[in-house]
């Protein structure tokens, strides 16, 4: 069992989410970690606004490294490094996780968490992989996250200007798409890809509307093909023109 607590390196963002200051929250987090440890529950410490804050603007990667170290110092079991609003760019993701692994090289302690708001989270995933990160958080269909408001089982715009205008911006990178990406890079992962794609399609049927995965529609890169879609007559035409079956260029 595990629970999660989150801090933002930019204090205005942190205050908007928690209602308290960073120093006060750290005290509460340490108290909660001790309580959890007493009953065998692990604590995952989240660091947010690593690559920028939607409220305070630019942030320093070095601050996020310090926050990561402090989480571990007060007893967190592992760290979720979160891009909660899709601010990250691939070069900065690589730079950050290189800094993290130089400081704390145990990859089992680190989890990458990328929200999809600009259709570039797959590039961030690749950059984190290249830096050496092994663990990623994803959700089927990209569900979760902002906005937290639902009406008739559908995500709707949150209240206030802080929320995205488009309620489809509701969560993490899609598990289906990320898994296909990793699988086709030849990286071992231990998942049944076809089963995950099936689950993604079933989830869309369950919620009753289109989610964000492209892989559940377009599938994996074909290796066998679909000859039932072939235009009839190619073999006869090649024979008529005096071409061999596998000839690609004129002689």
Placement of each model-derived feature along the sequence:
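Catalytic cores and adjacent flexible loops of soluble metabolic enzymes
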Residues: 1-251
């Amino acid at each position: 069992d595990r629970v999660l607590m989150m801090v933002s390196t930019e204090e205005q963002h942190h205050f908007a989410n928690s209602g308290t200051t960073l120093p006060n929250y750290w005290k509460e987090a340490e108290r909660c970690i001790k309580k959890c440890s007493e009953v065998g529950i692990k604590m995952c410490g989240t660091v947010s606004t690593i690559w920028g804050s939607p409220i305070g603007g630019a942030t320093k990667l070095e601050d996020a490294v310090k926050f990561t170290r402090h989480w571990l110092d007060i007893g967190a079991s592992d760290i979720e490094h979160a891009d909660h609003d899709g601010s990250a760019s691939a070069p900065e993701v690589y730079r950050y996780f290189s800094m993290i692994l130089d400081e704390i090289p145990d990859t089992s302690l680190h989890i990458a968490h990328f929200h999809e708001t600009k259709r570039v989270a797959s590039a961030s995933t690749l950059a984190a992989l290249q830096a050496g990160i092994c663990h990623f958080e994803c959700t089927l269909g990209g569900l979760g996250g902002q906005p937290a408001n639902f009406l008739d089982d559908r995500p709707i715009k949150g209240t206030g200007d802080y929320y995205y205008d488009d309620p489809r911006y509701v969560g993490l990178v899609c598990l289906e798409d990320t898994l296909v990406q990793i699988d086709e890079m030849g990286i071992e992962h231990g998942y049944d890809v076809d089963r995950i794609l099936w689950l993604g399609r079933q989830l869309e049927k369950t919620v009753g509307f289109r989610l964000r995965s492209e892989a559940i529609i377009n599938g994996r890169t074909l290796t066998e093909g679909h000859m039932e879609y072939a235009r009839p007559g190619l073999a006869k035409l090649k024979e008529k023109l005096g071409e061999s079956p596998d000839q690609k260029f004129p002689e």
